Amino acid sequence: DLAKVSIDAARNKLMDILSNYQGFIGCTLILVFDAYKVKGNQGEVQKYHNIYVVYTKEAETADQYIEKTTHEIGRKYKVTVATSDALEQVIVMGQGAYRISARDFYEEVERTEKQIREINERERGEQKNYLLNYAKEEDAKHMEAVRLGEITEK
């Protein structure tokens, strides 16, 4: 597990995965990291590529941040919260948000990554790069004639 080696590397990998997911799905995505035990932390919201990354402030848990944010925007926008915490699910649903379990969200992200790979492989197969595609027309005709044995180069 990457988290056992470096928590920062694990966070960055998660942010990259969710950034790809967001780009494919097209939703606004907010990733919340718990930083409530970090002394003097003022909290921070960063833009990482196409997602928002929140580090909670000292004495504020990720759950508290999610509850507050869901309360502010949950009735105006379609908000989905990924959590397996049963109490948190009840609270955010009471604020008008949808909920998805962490396991279900993980599986959705995995399916999305698979779709992205399949699309990339299909497009890569359709866009083969051949030298003749980039040659001038007269050079391409000459090389084709050589290939077919119509012209012998000495």
Per-region residue spans from a language model:
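Nuclease catalytic cores that cleave nucleic-acid phosphodiester bonds
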Residues: 1-154
